[in-house]
UniProtKB/Swiss-Prot annotation:
Subcellular location: Virion
GO cellular component: viral envelope; viral outer capsid
Family named by the database record: Belongs to the orbivirus VP7 family.
Gene3D superfamilies: 2.60.120.170, Bluetongue Virus 10, subunit 1, domain 1, Bluetongue Virus 10, subunit 1, domain 3
The organism's taxonomic lineage, starting at the top: Viruses, Riboviria, Orthornavirae, Duplornaviricota, Resentoviricetes
Chief location bin: virion
Pfam assignment, any one: Orbi_VP7
Top-rank lineage group of the source organism: Viruses
The protein's role, per its UniProt record: Major structural core protein; binds to structural protein VP3. Constitutes the surface of the AHSV core.
GO molecular function, one term: structural molecule activity
Name the record gives this protein: Core protein VP7
């Protein structure tokens, strides 16, 4: 499977470089395209040219790239255009060992496969408390029972209200609401001025403290917490106090936009509006894979096939589309009148 994806990626990337007839082709590009086009033409009865010049020739090369992307992703899209029919025999061309793949293409595919077979800490994009079902007003003292109470202010900040002389552990409060957190990096600070339940202004008592695994940590210092070591708070003073905890970032075993290199910019490229035709084609491919067709997903992709589709094949196909400038019709797509502008693009995403 890796070899087929790497061959498809190599061919698609090579096709980006052939649009200028005045430029001498790289020997590796000539070898890759020479063999790939010969195998593809033989199996599909197409007539793709290595140096496309006319509109029809550019269309043919783009259709070949589309066929190879769909074959590598194991996707059948059906009748989507009066000008294009998917050549299902393309997988036979990609399966042949004669088509070389370049080193970068195979490295990209192998890295994706390897990363998705294991787990490692990566920075999470959303706040640790995004899953909290309620929040409270910052700086408002509220301890309805007991001597301490913690609550969330927003997706990154929690506060602990403490009576005079109170102490307690806040592990459950500080731990993220979802996912397998590895390390949390936070700072804590006492709220100098806050309000009691009646709205009167109060000043936190001096001497409030936070310990992590029994070690005092200074206010304002970045603390690296493994979510296991006990985090204790104390207010030895004679007045009520509020401590604020701000999570700067945290790592988790969940997939993130850093799981593989350049995933975030490639998602942007995948979902960029190139033309109405490309917008529709990309949507059809993603719909067949049960992926978000128009807008990027809320959470980073978690499956190998999704990342291959995003990071390599569909983004590379967008580059080929921009380079070859194919002109073909998509069922149900009406060409816009006038120049593409922000308003038209915004309407396409809505």
């Amino acid at each position: 499977m890796d070899a087929i994806a790497a061959r498809a990626l190599s061919v698609v990337r090579a096709c980006v470089t052939v649009t200028d007839a005045r430029v001498s082709l790289d020997p590796g590009v000539m070898e890759t395209l020479g063999i790939a086009i010969n195998r593809y033409n033989g199996l599909t009865n197409h007539s793709v040219s290595m140096r496309p010049q006319t509109q029809a020739e550019r269309n043919e090369m783009f259709f070949m790239c589309t066929d190879m992307v769909l074959a590598a992703l194991n996707v059948q899209i059906g009748n989507i255009s009066p000008d294009y029919d998917q050549a299902l025999a393309t997988v036979g061309a990609l399966a042949t060992t004669e088509i070389p793949y370049n080193v970068q293409a195979m490295n990209d595919i192998v890295r994706i496969t390897g990363q998705m077979q294991t787990f490692g800490p990566s920075k999470v994009q959303t706040g640790p408390y995004a899953g909290a079902v309620e929040v409270q007003q910052s700086g408002r003292y509220y301890v309805p029972q007991g001597r301490t109470r913690g609550g969330y202010i927003n997706s990154n900040i929690a506060e602990v209200c403490m009576d005079a002389g109170a102490a307690g552990q806040v592990n459950a409060l500080l731990a993220p609401r979802r996912g397998d957190a590895v390390m949390i990096y936070f700072v804590w600070r006492p709220l100098r001025i806050f309000c009691d339940p009646q709205g009167a202004s109060l000043e936190s008592a001096p001497g409030t403290f936070v310990t992590v695994d029994g070690v005092n940590v200074a206010a304002g210092d970045v603390v690296a917490w493994n979510t296991i070591a006990p985090v204790n708070v104390g207010n030895p003073g004679a007045r009520r106090s509020i401590l604020q905890f701000e999570v700067l970032w945290y790592t988790s075993l969940d997939r993130s936009l850093d799981t593989v290199p350049e995933l975030a910019p490639t998602l942007t490229r995948c979902y960029a509006y190139v033309s109405p035709t490309w917008h529709a084609l990309r949507a059809v491919i993603f719909q067949q894979m049960n992926m978000q067709p128009i807008n990027p997903p809320i959470f980073p992709p978690t499956e190998r096939n999704e990342i291959v589709a995003y990071l390599l094949l569909v983004a590379s196909l967008a580059d080929v589309y921009a380079a070859l400038r194919p002109d073909f019709r998509m069922n149900g797509v009406v060409a816009p009148v006038g120049q593409i502008n922000r308003a038209l693009v915004l309407a396409a995403y809505h």
